[in-house]
């Protein structure tokens, strides 16, 4: 490699060197800015501005040199002459623009000292020449030799680069530590594995304050670097197409965080492994991936590395609060420790996955079962409550699955000891002279509690009697509907013939205008009365003979009253529908064996009465399948005289459950034969 120096301006006599210098300066600028971006210093913006200004001066100086000035520089003399003695070295007068010279890095690093250039580089030929165009770049190259401008032989005689041409394909980049130190494919792999010797990012505190690279002594032991989570965005960095920054050299065991990954891919760590790490460095070379043939952008690489599982970071700390150096650990344990951190990070980020068989069950428990005491009571008392719930959940449609918990509670509430306890209180109240609690002038605590107990019994008794009477009301309506259906079927043939004859007579009378008149008749004139509607009308006429509906367009007081009564009658018939289904499925006294809202399972009358018909059918089918035999026996035993006792028509009959202690009923087992014995009369 032939280098020349002019006595006046230290110009270079190769036009291609201008492009080389520009590439090196831009590469140095980008590497330096990326190094700044990996730190979390508060004065990052100020340091960035200073570096940009100094680098801009270098670029302007390099770009201002034209080919004419380069070739016409007089008295060009060699900057480096192999015949010159080693102690005579010309100095460079132009300073680089950085305030401090670059410090020495290590003993193993080729430094710019005295010596002669190796023959391989001197005789590389005209096509492989690499010359410098400006003393500023010479000064940057020779910073370690205190701006002597002397190109050392040790820098170019390294054993790893013997026989390598300057424009060889294997020589694809410059080292980030020393721009005069070539970096081959083999060294790129070794440099990536070398970064694994450091835990976290390097500490750039002293470097930012002096704008120089830190020396080897400051990195003798790993320093707890800053968090990579607060990396500033390099939106103002200028991208150059011919720049080879961010060479992708990714290793599975080394890519652990964003900060170290940026340093790895950009080659920014200005330290050489010491001799104590050389064995580890050589052993780890075999596990490093080959470098990517094309450069990867810094931002795209950062996003890629974050997807691979970056290490969790913390907020950046000020310079005066940073953690000091800590003792270095065994380097062989670093890949294992980092892999464990990545595993923990992936475990925190990865959502729990379950098999398809268990996913439905989890959704049922999380979204369907309400966290109320009645459900907890059912799951705590009954071992098969889970099975019952899942059965209802599977049989119900998607829009009715939220009723599974209610059906599960109702399944155990029918004919339960709690239902018998409430029935005992209702029977006791029905045998008294007055169902209304007696009035007390004094505000006595015992009397107040006694009245409340009596009112609860009154509520239970009223609920049971209401069920009976609702079923009777619906039964009346059903009988009227059946009568209308039978009458309609009886006169169907005669009515059809009569209708046909009347229509023919009407057509003959009206002639041509008959079809037009038939089409203009309103729908109300041709209103068809269904059997249910006519049965409801008959009920209203029987119950309220003095009321009649209003005519069209006329509103009267009697008509409004009729409408209110009709609405109330329809609501009662709707409430009686489900109780009627219970009575048909378990004939007898099943209506008295369903507890009220005061029970442990919290079954209110609204819960049962507002269940859809299809849902109630599913419930009754499963209830009859599982507990049908027991409930049918209990309903038949109580049905003989229960209604008469509740209505106080015959209070002489007594049941065994009335003579049983309340605790005995509460502690009773479900579907136990002893409960059937309590339903018998004395």
Curated annotation (Swiss-Prot):
The biotechnology note for this entry reads: Pneumocandin B0 is the starting molecule for the first semisynthetic echinocandin antifungal drug, caspofungin acetate. Pneumocandin B0 is a minor fermentation product, and its industrial production was achieved by a combination of extensive mutation and medium optimization. Inactivation of three of gloP/GLP450-1, gloO/GLP450-2, and gloM/GLOXY1 generates 13 different pneumocandin analogs that lack one, two, three, or four hydroxyl groups on 4R,5R-dihydroxy-ornithine and 3S,4S-dihydroxy-homotyrosine of the parent hexapeptide.
Q: Where is the composition biased (Polar residues)?
A: 257-279, 310-320
Where does this protein have compositionally biased stretches of type Low complexity? 63-73
Q: Basic and acidic residues bias located where?
A: 335-349
Q: What does this protein do?
A: Part of the gene cluster that mediates the biosynthesis of pneumocandins, lipohexapeptides of the echinocandin family that prevent fungal cell wall formation by non-competitive inhibition of beta-1,3-glucan synthase. The 10,12-dimethylmyristoyl side chain is synthesized by the reducing polyketide synthase gloL/GLPKS4. The thioesterase gloN/GLHYD exclusively interacts with gloL/GLPKS4 to maintain turnover of the polyketide side chain.
The record's region (Disordered) falls at 63-86, 107-129, 251-358
Q: What is this protein called?
A: Pneumocandin biosynthesis cluster protein B
